[in-house]
């Protein structure tokens, strides 16, 4: 992986590596430059529309869409001229969810994700089955983040 694009910012705290960042393009910044990091990132579009590029594939997104970017994947976020997008980045280390090496979920699902074996991001659009379930998970994470506070 190209080290020039490696984001090394610590998200959350060392003992609890989780944070939610509300963002708006173009209000907060004009775009999010191409980068990668070791954390999992879930991008939930709250309002408007834009484009999320993961590796070499560009995904048009709009209000309600949820996109999961796996550790190590190059990604960028942008909007077209005159477009706006409000979204939140939910960023966390997969190690927070892992059990010991005997745990089936850790061995067969989380470790492969952490080791970069996932090749395609997951895009969940409003009209897809289970979107409502994922939306509720995002709402719970938001609620948890409000209770926990910053950092």
Regions inferred by a protein language model and the residue ranges of each:
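A hydrophobic/aromatic-rich effector-binding and dimerization subdomain
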Residues: 2-19, 74-142
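N-terminal core-binding DNA-recognition domain of tyrosine site-specific recombinases/integrases
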Residues: 148-151
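Generic protein-terminus/edge-of-domain signal
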Residues: 1-66, 73, 107, 115-121
